[in-house]
Amino acid sequence: VLSSHDKSNVKGLFGKVGGHLEEYCAETLARMFAAYPQTKTYFPHFDLQPGSAQVKAHGKKVAGALAEAANHIDDIASALSKLSDLHQHKLRVDPVNFKLLAHCFLVVMAIHHPSLLTPEVHASLDKFLCAVGTVLTAKYR
C-alpha cells in the first residue's frame, strides 16, 4: 500500500523527469530485452535493437501507462483497467515480466537521476511499480 509520503515521492519524481519519460521507458525496454532475453518472446515482430522505432513506440506506451498511473495514484486499478484487460485476455504476458521491467526502470532512473533517487524515493518508486504490476496482473486469476 502506498503511503501519502510514497505518493508524494512518486509524483515529485515523475514531475521532474516527465519530459524524458518516453525516452527512459524505451531505454528500460531495451535494457530488459538485453538482460532478460526471454522477454523478447512477446515481441516477435519487433526490431528489438536499442533505439529502434518499435522499441521507442512501445516505450511511449509504457510511459503513457506509468504517467496515467501516477496521475491517478489513488486509484491505479481504475486508471489501468483497460490495459489490465488487454494483458489478461490478449497479450497474456507472464506476470514476472512486470517485475523485470520495474527493475530495469529503477536502474534507468538511477543512471539518469542518481541525486533524485534517494533511498526513500527509490523505495516509494519500487512500491509504485509493484502496485502497477499487481494491477496489470490482477485479472489473470
UniProtKB/Swiss-Prot annotation:
GO molecular function: haptoglobin binding; heme binding; iron ion binding; organic acid binding; oxygen binding; oxygen carrier activity; peroxidase activity
Tissue expression as described in the entry: Red blood cells.
Ranges for domain Globin: 1-141
Binding sites annotated in the UniProt record for heme b: 87
Residues annotated for O2 binding in this entry: 58
Top-level taxon of origin: Eukaryota
A GO cellular-component term linked to this record: haptoglobin-hemoglobin complex
GO process annotations (BP): hydrogen peroxide catabolic process
InterPro entries: Globin, Globin-like_sf, Globin/Proto, Hemoglobin_a-typ, Hemoglobin_oxygen_transport, Hemoglobin_pi
Tagged with keyword Iron: yes
Coiled-coil ranges per UniProt: none
Keyword tags: Heme, Iron, Metal-binding, Oxygen transport, Transport
Function: Involved in oxygen transport from the lung to the various peripheral tissues.
Subunit: Heterotetramer of two alpha chains and two beta chains.
Family as reported in the entry's similarity comment: Belongs to the globin family.
UniProt name for this protein: Hemoglobin subunit alpha-A
Native source species: Phoenicopterus ruber (American flamingo)
Gene this protein is translated from: HBAA
